[in-house]
Amino acid sequence: MSVFLCFLCLLPLILIFLKNLKPSKWKLPPGPKKLPIIGNLHQRRELHPRNSRNLSEKYGPIVFLRYGFVPVVVISSKEAAEEVLKTHDLECCSRPETVGTRAISYNFKDIGFAPYGEDWRTMRKLSVVELFSSKKLQSFRYIREEENDLCVKKLSDLASRRSLVNLEKTLFTLVGSIVCRIGFGINLRECEFVDEDSIDDLVHKSEDVIRNSIFSDFFPGLMGRLIEWIFSERKRLNRLYSEVDTFFQNILDDHLKPGRESSDIIDVMIDMMKKQEKEGDSFKFTTDHLKGMISDIFLAGVGTSSTTLIWAMTELIRNPRVMKKVQDEIRTTLGDKKERITEEDLNQLHYFKLMVKEIFRLHPAAPLLLPRETLSHVKIQGYDIPAKTQIMINAYAIARDPKLWTNPDEFNPDRFLDSSIDYRGLNFELLPFGSGRRICPGMTMGIAIVELGLLNLLYFFDWGLPEKEEAKEIITGNEVALDLVQVFLH
């Protein structure tokens, strides 16, 4: 009986494998050799942004892989990216489904991971109107400035006592405080169910839910679920998801309390739900839509901006020449007697803006843009890309392509002095926020948070590392190492 069950489990895989042995009618992109059944699943590490540069060097700017029975195309050139994100944007604008993204998006009722369709269009339009429009961006300015003032006060106290600073945690707290006030009306210093110190942990657990692939993501039917059960894959995913979901549910419960005074995008959605119950609209908001929006705001808002700020300070500390040039411009332009920084101060700075652009180039928050999925067959650079193929845009590799950039691995804002290249989705050699229909809707908010945060850190303080050993680590290493830094009042 057990042998028969194993045969039934393996039968779909055997049939699909035999089907794949037939010569393909498509002119598929080149790629590494695929093993029976698992394809290139054993080479998933190759899709790490740094490793995938090696793939493109060996096979070209368009590489075809197969993870189990999931076809994947990796794009690593400006020209191919433009075809995907502009020429064939509509045909390539959906999202693949995985167990992790289904969980974190509440059954794809969000913006980031939802497939292309009515739900996605409605949610995106709502987010733009209620959260990311120019008018809303300006209305939240005081929150960004107040939270930066509090961060400066805290750092000034540490500097006066010559205490070391965990800058990584400090930046997660700063961004988390801004995003939670803007998105959810929650002050982390007064909140009953979350505090400042737990923000980075919640972000990392949310990211783990998305990144944790399990067998059913690559293999159909009973076989994938059986292997999941044997290795308890779903249990670990559910445990991570449960912690994150509790946080999101607490945010929603806080909005449902009677007598709530503040109004944010979640309150707007709750009001729309109540009206729809009476009016019977064709599109109906559900609790999953509410939590999907909460998830997007928290994960995309906190995770990306925090990571960018951390990388910016890492590069500046290990490149003191650039830091001095940026600080000289800031302090000469703004003077040395300002008690607080406002967003108006940003308009006076030029080299500072080039430095931010160089950070977006060298360290995009999403080195591999969120994967797209083709809705129909398309041709990219002469190759056939069938429907239901995952497309991964390697923004990291494109931004370090030696054909496009001189000394591409060097942190050098001067490269943009006479350049009109921008990072807002129209120049395909620089794609930190993506492009086309699925461009990050919170781009302007993210830029505002990063620029104001960096300006405060560089105007009021000087930065260094406490010991030579640590300095060597951050200068030569590729990873972020800002757990302990020295801060000095300017």
From Swiss-Prot:
It is an enzyme of class 1 (oxidoreductase). Its EC number is 1.14.-.-. Its cofactor is heme. Disulfide bonds: none annotated. The keyword Transmembrane applies. It is found in: Membrane. This is Cytochrome P450 71B28. The gene is CYP71B28.
